[in-house]
Amino acid sequence: MKYRTHKCNELSLDHVGEHVRLSGWVHRYRNHGGVVFIDLRDRFGITQIVCRQEENPELHQLMDQVRSEWVLCVEGLVCARLEGMENPNLVTGSIEVEVSSLEVLSRAQNLPFSISDEHINVNEELRLTYRYLDMRRGDILDRLMCRHKVMLACRQYLDEQGFTEVVTPILGKSTPEGARDYLVPSRIYPGNFYALPQSPQLFKQILMVGGLDRYFQIATCFRDEDLRADRQPEFTQIDMEMSFGGPEDLFPVVEELVTRLFAVKGIELKAPFLRMTYQEAKDSYGTDKPDLRFGLRLKNCCEYARKFTFSIFLDQLAHGGTVKGFCVPGGADMSRKQLDIYTDFVKRYGSMGLVWIKKQDGGVSSNVAKFASEDVFQEMFEAFEAKDQDILLLIAAPEAVANQALDHLRRLIAKERQLYDSTQYNFVWITDFPLFAKEEGELCPEHHPFTAPLDEDISLLDSDPFAVRSSSYDLVLNGYEIASGSQRIHNPDLQNKIFALLKLSQESVKEKFGFFIDALSFGTPPHLGIALGLDRIMMVLTGAETIREVIAFPKTQKAGDLMMSAPSEILPIQLKELGLKL
């Protein structure tokens, strides 16, 4: 049986007089007395079909029984709609199909939510439980189609650049990479476990040892971590690695790749992208993921804070803290109530409060006005280049607390005051991250233990490891990290030294990374790589609020699959076969 001669978006006035066959879902149904109208929908569009009782009573009776989301196959004659009855909102709005035969291919039970009315808000848990129905509402399928085109563009470009797509193993060895592993018990080796990959990191580096030169993969990765709006337990990244190069070789490749991906949506980007060191980003924006669509740059105010008699300023400065903030143009219109709300907001991030200083009619209005002279306030206005009716917002706190609080406050105010264009795309490379972070007083990798230190900082590894910068880089878009990578360590002695600084014993290194150290010992080319978060890129490209909206079958924020009721218990016999007990 031939189910269709045309898709539901293809018919026009050029087809008037033709007999056609269409298949699809009942999108909307209307019975106007002796005339039944049905909007028939497939993935491509909608066509109106019609049956008149006086012309075909039996068919009219059958169509009168049809309900929403039934699947039909219809045959009929393409006719022009009557003048004034055209629908300009449909590609096929100038025609309709007068049905001569109809077959019900599948019936649908009562729907848990409306498919035809996309504007009705539906509880997300209900949508995820019936994901297949949610897909029919339009946005999800559109995003999946966009994702498909983005992946095609990715493969085509990287192939042009000499990258080879290689699929690396899903079942691998558990190695410390930051987050918890998802573990898979082995039936063949009782008591032993595979780990699902948090990334193909070691495999892609070993491919460079093997001489592949340039590798890529659209890889599925797994991390058992707490979820946020932009995280999933399983996610997809565009994974890349290349030999005999440095960041100056990689950056143009990635910039052109991103440009091609955005071109899928008709968005034109300008390269090269801005670059900023980690320290510059922290100093000016309070974060290593700055949103550069708006100003509100942070400024260190310690020089002026020392001239205050305000105890909170002086106490923070005496104990190594900082005083910093930003200027909001025209912000002097903020009410005391609004400023109290902002004060409560920054307290969530550990700040003791919020200092505000308004420049109004050449004078000063501030909640710390009595703690400094007029001259000090004027010096601060000059430093911030504040104009009349601007406001300065300051925080006195330890550096990390001040940065975090001001970063969030800056974003909140920019959103509330509409200081940026949501269709603007501001990319920035963040470079020169610290090689190590501090966790409970101990060294831990800022990115991962395979990141190379900058050559000029290697001498500091023994004397001042926290001062060592890494040859690593993140690509940030509008406050989202969409890619992260680094130059890799290709010297086994240096790699062992990094492991030792991380207090991994020789036995532990041999057990977890022995195969990798062996590989590095057989002639390893200098190499580097990067991974782009495909889900996050799609989230930005399609305007989705969460990455769940750009994944066909996402997990909830509690890592559950509501449609399949996973995770679920398994049978005792399955546990026994695996040699496990609960």
UniProtKB/Swiss-Prot annotation:
One of its GO terms (biological process) is aspartyl-tRNA aminoacylation. The record marks 32, 84 as: Important for tRNA non-discrimination. Coiled coil: none annotated. Its EC number is 6.1.1.23. L-aspartate binds at residues 177, 223, 447, 488. Pfam families: GAD, tRNA-synt_2, tRNA_anti-codon. It is found in: Cytoplasm. Transmembrane segments: none annotated. GO terms for cellular component: cytoplasm. ATP binds at residues 223-225, 232, 481, 533-536. One of its GO terms (molecular function) is aspartate-tRNA ligase activity. It catalyses: tRNA(Asx) + L-aspartate + ATP = L-aspartyl-tRNA(Asx) + AMP + diphosphate. Residues 201-204 are annotated as: Aspartate. It comes from the Bacteria. Keywords: Aminoacyl-tRNA synthetase, ATP-binding, Cytoplasm, Ligase, Nucleotide-binding, Protein biosynthesis. Its main location: cytoplasm. Homodimer. HAMAP family: Asp_tRNA_synth_type1 (MF_00044). PANTHER family: ASPARTATE--TRNA LIGASE, MITOCHONDRIAL, ASPARTYL/LYSYL-TRNA SYNTHETASE. Belongs to the class-II aminoacyl-tRNA synthetase family. Type 1 subfamily. Aspartyl-tRNA synthetase with relaxed tRNA specificity since it is able to aspartylate not only its cognate tRNA(Asp) but also tRNA(Asn). Reaction proceeds in two steps: L-aspartate is first activated by ATP to form Asp-AMP and then transferred to the acceptor end of tRNA(Asp/Asn). This is Aspartate--tRNA(Asp/Asn) ligase. It comes from Chlamydia trachomatis serovar L2 (strain ATCC VR-902B / DSM 19102 / 434/Bu).
